[in-house]
Amino acid sequence: MLVGHSYGGVVATEAGTDPTVTKLVYIAAFAPDRAESVATLIQNPPPGAPVPPILPPQDGFLFLDKAKFHASFAADVDAEKAAFMADAQVPWGVGALDGAVTEPAWRTRPNWYLVATDDKMIPPPAQRAMAERAGATVTEAEGSHAIYVSKPDVVAALIRTAATAA
């Protein structure tokens, strides 16, 4: 079973076609279809959708603006923990934006999707649309993009449900 959060959903979608993978779990994640990438999924945001505070590339990598991290990524996480998360960001390669999925695993694998209803990075309507298209079993919970930090019990329960499903 693969579990992906955010961009990790792209990785799970592509890698999940491996025969040893039997299930997928998306946590406020991108779930692209064939030939889609993060770039194609974010090119036409819904009207009024928040714009993620991604800084211009630095040496081929992307980061979120630390000053806006708490409000945009982890609004339901206490300020001290959110500041630590902002400081500990892992750089994201610019090339990852355009990496298109060749064969989406969700077409042939059962999958679950947790929609974070207060997410300001991937709009909840976009999450719902990707989950519906993937035929996912959907759970919704109030939470930011960092729902795995603010609501770990909800995330763990969904993973447990998927892991024990027939």
PLM features: what roles do these ranges have?
Residues W106-N111, R133-A136:
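Short, proline-enriched alpha-helix->beta-strand connector loops that line the catalytic pocket
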Residues K66-D76:
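Helix-loop "lid/cap" segments that line or gate small-molecule binding pockets
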Residues D87-A105:
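Active-site nucleophile elbow and catalytic-triad environment of alpha/beta-hydrolase enzymes
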Residues T117-G143, V149, V154, T161-A162:
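Conserved loop-alpha-helix segment in the C-terminal half of the alpha/beta-hydrolase fold
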Residues V3-G8, A12:
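Gly/Ala-rich beta-loop-alpha elbow adjacent to hydrolase catalytic centers
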Residues A15, I159-A162:
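Hydrophobic residues on the short alpha-helix immediately C-terminal to a glycine-rich phosphate/catalytic loop
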Residues Y113-V115:
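Short beta-strand/loop motif that positions the catalytic acidic residue
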Residues T17-K66, G93-L97, I122, M130:
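Flexible "cap/lid" loop of the alpha/beta hydrolase fold
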